[in-house]
UniProtKB/Swiss-Prot annotation:
Mg(2+) binds at residues 362, 499. The keyword Transmembrane helix does not apply. It catalyses: chorismate + L-glutamine = anthranilate + pyruvate + L-glutamate + H(+). One of its GO terms (biological process) is L-tryptophan biosynthetic process. L-tryptophan binds at residues 40, 292-294. The gene is trpE. Pathway: Amino-acid biosynthesis; L-tryptophan biosynthesis; L-tryptophan from chorismate: step 1/5. This is Anthranilate synthase component 1.
Length: 522
């Protein structure tokens, strides 16, 4: 029986502005799981723009091994879980009726055309049913129902006929936290607001939420403690593929290109090293390599942090504009032997990259792939390239970038858009499905978070995500840093191997520096 939909309440308070979100996270969240910090910075000036922190989550929704798990984390979330369960259609199987609720959606038929598959019942409808459980979202601020978390690369196997691979890690196919307590820092205007969302009519629970607001206001009024930096004697770095092995993969991939099966593919490799204190490593990474998207996700079984230069998918519900930001073409920054920046050398490297036929061909191919992805979901005549072949600079590398936008069809939402576009072409290649098949064969294991997307969406339908690159996935105090290179016909194997190392370098160095140790290469 369907239950009455929820009327939410939102409580807000302004708190003392403090400019270091990582220090706030360290003081307020500490090692608490189901917490998340999302930050943004200007691409060129590197000024910090906004930080959003899920301090308390009411509910967690995740998907792994074809099972959706919805867990209420507070009494506030229990009420929402009850209404959500009543909205499920009969063809959704309830495997466990308790908290956490475990459900299974029908397997998507691979014989439907693209549009039919977009409209078919899928695991994304679990998120839609959660949002539909609330009836008065439009009365409140846009972030009153705020979900933050991860779509993994391997989520694609639920929508395309791709191999199911093994993994030793515990990364779900998607994992999102529904915020109960959200901190929003506006670094431009130097404001700090704590938002608490109530999903219940229980007066005792509402009082607890209001009390929580006051407790946090008091905590945030005090000076912050510095982040603890652990020291390790030495740090061993090892890789699952040597340069020689990776070069052989590139040579083999080029055979498929010559045969006409693909135009490009993006094989990756994994670097491993100890990471005792991920938060301190994240602090060093964002200081040395400020990026448009920076993130620190703390789950029970893993921690994920990074500083990504590349948007995955961005959607504005008000203008209905959908955006992809392809990055393809990479060079190291022009630095002297002592590590200082040589501006003349940096400019010459940029000029070489901008005029390199191989890099331009690869980049334009991926711009075209982004155009094709958006064509599936946009109103006719609205898709276009807003920016073509600009250069973005970061601490260790520079990139060729473009921006492709369009207006989402009125019969689709942000989840349809993500389903149609995943995974981003800059992490797969083209044609996309065949490239992903080859990646499965080459790599032989799940990618997990790498190449997926992390960010947030709201109950009103806003979406902002970045591609999970320049990141570390930490489990059992071991960090996995994954990086790849786009292989085309003109690729030189050793140069592509070097590129994959350059992409991983900023994160590896941040982990080493935060633990005050030298890296021993194995």
């Amino acid at each position: 029986m369907k239950k009455n939909l929820i009327s939410i309440d939102v409580f807000l308070t302004e708190t003392r502005y403090q400019p270091n979100p990582t220090a706030i996270f360290n003081q307020i969240c500490k090692k608490k799981s189901e917490t998340l910090l999302l930050e943004s910075a200007e691409i060129n000036k590197k000024h910090h723009l906004e930080s959003m922190m899920i301090i308390d989550a009411a509910l967690k929704i995740s998907f792994l091994n074809q099972i959706v798990i919805v867990e209420a984390l507070t009494k506030n979330g229990v009420n929402l879980l009850s209404v959500f369960k009543s909205l499920l259609p009969k063809n959704v199987i309830i495997l466990s009726d308790n908290n956490p609720l475990e459900i299974k959606f029908p397997i998507l038929s691979m014989y439907l055309d693209e549009d039919q598959r977009l409209r078919s019942l899928s695991v994304f409808d679990a998120i839609r049913f959660l949002i539909k459980s609330v009836k008065n979202l439009s009365e409140f601020a846009p972030k009153s129902m705020f979900f933050g978390g991860l779509f993994s690369y391997d989520l694609i196997t639920s929508f395309e006929n791709l191999p199911i691979l093994n993994t030793h890690q515990h990364c779900p196919d998607f994992c999102f936290y529904l915020s109960e307590t959200l901190l929003i820092l506006d670094h431009k205007n130097k404001t700090s607001i704590v938002q608490v969302t109530s999903f219940t009519n229980d007066n005792f629970e509402k009082k607890r939420l209001k009390d929580r607001l006051e407790i946090l206001k008091n905590k945030l009024s005090k000076n912050l403690c510095p982040i603890k930096f652990d020291t390790l004697k030495n740090m061993k770095l090892w890789c699952n593929k040597t340069d020689e092995e990776y070069n052989k993969i590139i040579v083999n991939v080029k055979k498929f290109i010559l045969q006409g099966e693909i135009f490009q593919v993006v094989p990756s490799r994994k670097f491993y090293l100890s990471c005792v204190n991920p938060l301190s490593s994240y602090e060093v990474l964002k200081k040395n390599n400020p990026s448009p998207y920076m993130f620190f996700m703390q789950d029970r079984k893993f921690t994920l942090f990074g500083a990504s230069p590349e948007s995955a998918l961005k959607y504005d519900i008000n203008s209905r504009q959908i955006e992809i930001y392809p990055i393809a073409g990479t060079r190291p920054r022009g630095r002297r032997s002592d590590g200082s920046l040589d501006l003349d050398l940096d400019n010459r490297i940029e000029l070489e990259m901008r005029t390199n036929n191989k890099e331009l061909a690869e980049h334009l191919m991926l711009v075209d792939l982004a155009r094709n992805d958006l064509a599936k979901i946009c109103e006719p005549g609205t898709r276009h390239v807003a920016d073509l072949i600009r250069v973005d600079r970061y601490s260790h590398v520079m990139h060729l970038v473009s921006r492709v936008i369009g207006k989402l069809r009125f019969d689709l939402d942000f989840l349809h858009a993500y389903q149609a576009c995943m995974n981003m072409g800059t992490l797969t290649g083209a044609p996309k499905v065949r490239a992903m098949e080859l990646i499965s064969e080459i790599e032989g294991e799940k990618r997990g978070s790498y190449g997926g997307a992390i960010g947030y969406f709201t109950g009103l339908g806003m979406l902002d995500t970045c591609i999970v690159i320049r990141s570390a996935y930490v489990e059992n105090k071991i960090a996995t840093i994954q990086a790849g290179a786009g292989i085309v016909l003109d690729s030189v194997p050793q140069l592509e191997s070097d590129e994959s190392k350059n992409k991983a370098k900023a994160v590896i160095q941040a982990i080493a520096n935060s633990h005050s140790c030298q890296i021993e290469y194995l």
